[in-house]
Amino acid sequence: VNSFNGLCTYDENGEIAMDFAESYEASEDGLSYTFTLRDGLKWSDGTDLNANDFVYSWNRAASAETGADYAYMFDPIARKDDGTLDVTASEDGKTLTINLVSPCAYFLDLCAFPAFYAVPQASVEAADGWQDNPGAWCQEAGFVSSGAYTLESWTHNESMVYVKNPNYYRADEVKIERLEFMLSADDTAIYAAYNAGDLDFADTVPTDEIQSLLDNPEFHIIDNLGTYYVAFNVNSDLFAGKTPEQAAAMRRGLSLLIDRDYIVENIGQTGQQLANTFVPAGMADGNGGEFRQNDDAYTYPNADAVGYYDPSDDAYFDNLAEAIELLKEAGYEFVDDGNGNEVLSDATPIDITYITNDGSAHVAVAEAMQQDFAAIGANLTIETNEWNVFLNERKAGNFDMSRNGWLADFNDPINMLEMWTTDSGNNDVQFGR
C-alpha cells in the first residue's frame, strides 16, 4: 500500500518518473543532483513536507545509531567533515542538492526506493523510546505518513485497514477509499478466505493448489526479478576445521546436490527459471544490455549454461558426481552402499541444520533438499518457525543453512551484490563477521 512517497517513482512501463520532485538536474560529471520539489506537499497530518524532511530522513537511515538494514545503500552519497551525508536543502525547503562520491548510474532508482522516502521528524522523535527503538513511532495505526493512504487500524498478525489520505498531493486521482487486508502466514487460510468471498485478492496460494489453478482466469502469474537461494552461514560449525578452500569446495558440493529442476517443476510450478548465478537472468548491465551473458569481458565457467554450472535435469548425475568429488576434497570419506552408489562414510558424517519459515512452498523446498542430501547419506534437519522468529534467527546467524531470497529493489546488479559487505544489514551469511 502506498503510505509513503519519494522523490522519484516508476511509471507503468517501469521507467523512472518524478514523484514528490517535479524535476531534477544532474551535473555534467554526474557528481551532483539537484531536485526541485512540488509546491504544496503535505504530511497526512496537514503539516508541510519539504526538502529538509529528506535531509533528516536520509541521515537518519544512514546513521549507525539507527542500525537500518539498508544503511549501506546511502554509501554512494559523499560525506561532510562531520560525517553526515552531503545532502543540503535550500533555505525555502524547495530544492534538495546531493553530492556523490562518484557517478552512480542507478542513483535515480535509489531515489525511488522506500529507504530513501522521507519520514516525519516530529512524529519520530515524539514516540516513547525513539532513541533506542527507531521504529517506535510507527508500530501502531495512526502514524503520520505521506502517500495515498494512511493506516486507520492495525490488529497485529490479523488485519490492517488503510483509508484515503486527503492531504496526498494526488488525492483526486485516488479512487479506492478504503483497503482492508488479512494478515496471515497460513497460505491455506488465505486461499480459503478468498474462495469464501472474504478477499478480493490474494498474493499466495498453497503449493498443492497451483496445478488446478493454472487455467483459472482469476489466477495470474507475475514475473519478478530476483533469486531464491540457500544461504550458508560461513561461521557455522559445519565448516569447523576446514581450510577456506575446503569450505568453498564443501559449499559448492552441497549446492550441486540440489535438484533445482525438480523444485521448479513440482514446487514452483509457475515458470521459474533454474538459477546457476546469483544475479538473475534479465537484470540489466547498466549499458543497455543484460548482465548475465558471455562476452569479451567475461565468460562463465559453464559457457553453454551461461553460469557456474548446468542446473538442468540432464546434468543431474554429472552434478552429483562433481559434488562427491568436491566433498572428498573437503575431507569427507565415501564408501560403496552395496548398490554401486557412493555414500558418506560413518567416519565423516554431514549433519546440517536448515532453517525456514512455515510457508508451504518453503517447507516443500526444504524437504526436497533433504531428499537430495540423503542421496549421499548427508542429514538435513529442518527447523521451521513463524516469520518473525525465522527472520531473527537468520539475522543472528543461528543456522548452518537457511532459506533465503532477494527480489531486486532496482534493476542493477549492484543491488544483488552490495548486500554482502561486512556492515550490510542484509549480510545473512555473516561474511567478514
Segments predicted by a language model, with ranges:
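Ligand-site clamp/hinge motif
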Residues: 135-140, 166-212, 370, 379-381, ...
